[in-house]
């Protein structure tokens, strides 16, 4: 697909895999996990629009929202049953794909899928409202600082200036995705949706991640027919990077 940077870590051609990354990052961070999988799957990962080496996100007035656009891009790379892996926002896209086409999923690995609608959390909703207000007021640096304090591998002020600029330029995408994540605009949680996923599902969480992460995992697991859960000791939200060995298993 034009304008989308695809990355590839060759492996078993009979086990195609697709990995979907989180916001404010790129598909390159799957390299650590791909290396530890030692070719067990043929893994691909694309940079989300506005991230990494993909084109900037430029929504059309009558076009899809960001979450829908990412879902369509991901679906375009699936032509047979796939081992689907998603982290954070990528996890919600993976879950959306699995609900829409369960027959296309060989296995589903969800690493802290941030589908906040699955576990209503007043603190998290207040955080999203605060970030929206900061962004609307033009305080992108403070919005990025608030976001990274909870979800980042390190604090905003610990990042080099180039990375801080990267965060500021893209932080508005966090607010833009709030309806998809907090209100389930894609209707992922519709009756019978999660229950239709017949592939084995593994939900991985960082032990030290925000409480809402564990509440979401519990709510999703309660409805999935074939599900396992794993908690990585000492890990937080960016565990695919900080704890690649444990995540790869």
Annotated model-derived regions:
Residues 122, 139-178:
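Conserved alpha/beta-hydrolase catalytic His-Asp/Glu region
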Residues 95-136, 183:
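Flexible "cap/lid" loop of the alpha/beta hydrolase fold
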Residues 163-223, 228-231:
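Conserved serine/cysteine hydrolase catalytic core
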Residues 19-22, 88, 206:
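Glycine-rich His-Gly loop
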Residues 35, 44-85, 89, 249:
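Active-site loop/oxyanion-hole signature of alpha/beta-hydrolase fold enzymes
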